[in-house]
């Protein structure tokens, strides 16, 4: 029987929590869920040897490349193709043996006896799909829950799911050529810790903060990678309605993939549009320099079945979030990198000729739509450049409060909370936003305060790094801590990248975070109590938008 409870929309019923029958709420079948568990288990085994090899002076970058890529494939709404996971499992087994040999050779060369490891280091995956599925329950996240209890399993899950989010951001940086030995070493250490099957709750919560600290380093690395590769985000008016012509829609998060598509479609008479979390690409100078980057269409991931069906061209998924393609567009959607869906064409060689051919064969937009625009590009480079103006506005009473409202979106009606907060924030407040949660209000009119826009789109979910930088700069300007600022954080979560970001905020000691719309299923009442007492968390948001606004506004500089 499958078991998965890593996303916000996991099944919750009187019978229990977690998706235990196929398909899960994300569309994942039992085979894929089981294979993902095996692959994750093997990643821990690889890390066991990689950490020890590194201690012997042997750091193997290809091994760490595979760890991050492999974990990324197991995120919610990334890869649903069981056959791909069979291949990845086979590859993981080979890579584990390779790093094991490197470790043992290095130990012997230094006159030391190699450790005899256990757990994931020794797990031998079966050769066939049928046999692999028989093995899967033994390595599932909830294996031995009857003996260990749900608190221990939940604390382990918090660490693991945070690491999956870290892996996604690290992979985006690595495809741009940015890697850090410090990051790789810490990732190996955390996965090795999980491989030891820890049971101490307080120790595991401390380790989860290590995941948060690691994610801070990775988000900073990705910010440098994006800025060095494409320039710093600029304030940009981006079109959100189509223009006449052939068209390609690019969704996901990977700016490197978008750059390749833009380069290969130059002078082809094809317009390229972004979708979802790819919206901030339109603010990067070296990407918006392509004249056929025509703007952004659509909204958050959960609306893609309707939006993709209406789009008159091919769609390219560069990362999560993919959901089951509708019949009307399944033959014109493509996946890249870690993404996969059964029966959908996958491009793994960087050649987008099939996408270009599809764009030319499909009708495209037959006329310009009425022009509509929104303003984006308020990353930390932009905001820190006008920090003095913002500080003066606060000192003169023009800006009373800051709200950070964003994160992952989803289908729950309870997520209207975030719309209510943003729309009802008073006229002397500024709303910063990021991630796909912004689509709930980023087309609304917010106006400005003395030329400072009241709605500041900071970027993708990983641009939480920018929000942290800005908050730190404001705290320094006012000679106070971040928790003393007139700043309220309302974080919407859906999948594992949001888990990593949340852990990063906790690692920074930021208190009073509003998290929702529901509690992560793996956080048991015991774990919630420990987190609430230490971090002053408020984990129940439903129906409290107006009350939370009043409470927030009582906290002023």
From Swiss-Prot:
Its cofactor is [4Fe-4S] cluster; hybrid [4Fe-2O-2S] cluster. Transmembrane segments: none annotated. It comes from the Bacteria. CDD domains: HCP (cd01914). It is found in: Cytoplasm. GO terms for cellular component: cytoplasm. The modification Cysteine persulfide is found at residue 408. Its EC number is 1.7.99.1. Coiled coil: none annotated. Keywords: 4Fe-4S, Cytoplasm, Iron, Iron-sulfur, Metal-binding, Oxidoreductase. Belongs to the HCP family. This is Hydroxylamine reductase. It comes from Acidithiobacillus ferrooxidans (strain ATCC 53993 / BNL-5-31) (Leptospirillum ferrooxidans (ATCC 53993)).
């Amino acid at each position: 029987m499958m078991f998965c409870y890593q996303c916000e929309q996991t099944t919750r019923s009187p019978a229990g929590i977690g998706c235990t029958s196929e398909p899960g709420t994300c569309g994942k079948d039992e085979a894929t869920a089981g294979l993902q568990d095996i692959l994750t288990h093997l990643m821990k085994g690889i890390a066991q040897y990689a950490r020890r090899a590194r201690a012997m002076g042997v750091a193997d970058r290809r091994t760490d490349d595979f760890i991050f890529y492999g974990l990324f494939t197991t995120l919610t709404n990334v890869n649903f193709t069981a056959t791909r996971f069979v291949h990845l499992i086979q590859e993981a087994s080979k890579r584990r043996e390779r790093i094991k040999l490197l470790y043992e050779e290095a130990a012997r060369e230094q006159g030391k006896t190699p450790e005899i490891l256990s757990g994931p280091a020794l797990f031998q995956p079966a050769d066939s799909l049928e046999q692999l599925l028989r093995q899967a329950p033994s390595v599932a996240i909830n294996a031995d829950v009857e003996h260990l209890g749900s608190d221990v399993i939940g604390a382990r899950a918090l660490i693991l799911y945070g690491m999956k989010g870290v892996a996604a951001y690290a992979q985006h940086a690595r495809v741009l050529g940015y890697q850090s030995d410090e990051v790789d070493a810490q990732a190996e250490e955390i996965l090795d810790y999980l491989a030891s099957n820890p049971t101490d709750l307080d120790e595991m919560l401390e380790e989860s903060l290590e995941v948060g600290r690691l994610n801070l380093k990775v988000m900073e690395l990705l910010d440098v990678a994006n800025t060095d590769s494409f320039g710093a985000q600029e304030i940009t008016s981006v079109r959100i309605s189509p223009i006449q012509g052939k068209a390609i829609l690019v969704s996901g998060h990977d700016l490197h993939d978008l750059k390749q598509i833009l380069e290969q479609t130059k002078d082809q008479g094809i317009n390229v549009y972004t979708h979802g979390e790819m919206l901030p690409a339109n603010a990067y100078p070296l990407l918006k320099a392509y004249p056929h980057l025509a703007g952004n269409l659509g909204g958050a991931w959960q609306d893609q079945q309707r939006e993709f069906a209406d789009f008159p061209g091919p769609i390219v998924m560069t990362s999560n979030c993919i959901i089951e393609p509708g019949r009307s567009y399944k033959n014109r959607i493509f996946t890249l990198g870690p993404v996969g869906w059964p029966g959908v064409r996958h491009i793994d060689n960087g050649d987008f000729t099939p996408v270009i051919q599809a764009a030319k064969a499909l009708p495209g937009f037959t006329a310009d739509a009425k022009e509509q625009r929104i303003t984006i590009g308020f990353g930390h480079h932009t905001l820190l450049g006008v920090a003095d103006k913002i500080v003066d506005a606060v000192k003169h009473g023009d800006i009373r409060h800051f709200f950070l409202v964003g994160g992952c979106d989803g289908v729950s009606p309870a997520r209207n909370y975030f719309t209510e907060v943003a729309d009802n924030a008073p006229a002397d407040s500024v709303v910063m936003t990021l991630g796909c949660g912004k689509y709930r209000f980023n087309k609304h009119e917010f106006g400005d305060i003395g030329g400072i826009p009241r709605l500041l789109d900071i970027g993708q979910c990983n641009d939480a790094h920018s929000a942290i930088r800005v908050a730190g700069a404001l705290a320094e300007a006012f000679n106070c801590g971040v928790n003393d600022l007139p700043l309220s954080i309302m974080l919407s979560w859906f999948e594992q990248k949001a888990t990593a970001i949340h852990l990063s905020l906790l690692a920074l000691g930021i208190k009073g975070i509003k998290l929702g719309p529901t509690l992560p299923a793996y956080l048991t009442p015991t774990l919630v109590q420990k987190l609430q007492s230490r971090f002053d968390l408020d984990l129940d948001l439903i129906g409290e938008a107006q009350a939370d606004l009043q409470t927030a506004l009582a906290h002023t500089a």
